[in-house]
Regions:
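Pepsin/retropepsin-fold aspartyl endopeptidases
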Residues: 1-147
Length: 147
């Protein structure tokens, strides 16, 4: 309740993230996050449980490497042990700090870029939505917070 009141008084609405523009242009739910003036596009993927960052952009994004490792299953069904890092991103003044699995997504993201024109830097999976209590509404084309 306090969060909603603060956001209303400050003029900030960080409780919803629109993916309408990306859906209209590319038919993919993509949200752009920021680190200062740098933009990073993330695919909202409820089919993935984990968040993934493309290892090829780690030199462009502030992150803290962690000792955490996890198994990552690719689309081909193969399991790989990958490292993780913590990344803090912002959206409309809200801060989102989360652990991302580091994976080489170059081929997949290049394919998406060639077919849709959108440059992706990572994937937000269902654990992110659960942590931040977000629900995807494809009628309104927003991700909104239940809190």
């Amino acid at each position: 309740m306090f969060k909603k009141l603060f956001n209303k008084l400050s003029g900030k609405n960080i409780e919803s993230m629109s993916f309408m523009e990306s859906m209209n242009l590319t038919e993919l739910p993509v949200v752009t996050f920021y680190q200062e003036d740098k933009k990073f596009n993330f695919l909202l993927d409820t089919g993935s449980s984990d968040c993934i960052i493309d290892k090829n952009i780690l030199d462009q994004i502030e992150h803290e490497e962690s000792d955490l490792q996890s198994n990552l299953f690719g689309l081909e069904g193969k399991r790989r042990l990958v490292k993780a890092c913590r990344i803090c991103l912002s959206y409309k003044g809200g801060q989102y700090e989360y652990d991302y699995l580091i994976s080489d997504m170059k081929d997949a993201f290049t394919n998406i870029k060639q077919t849709t024109g959108v440059t992706l830097h990572g994937i937000l999976g269902s654990k992110f939505f659960n942590t931040y209590k977000y629900v995807l509404d494809f009628d309104k084309m927003i991700a909104y917070s239940k809190v």
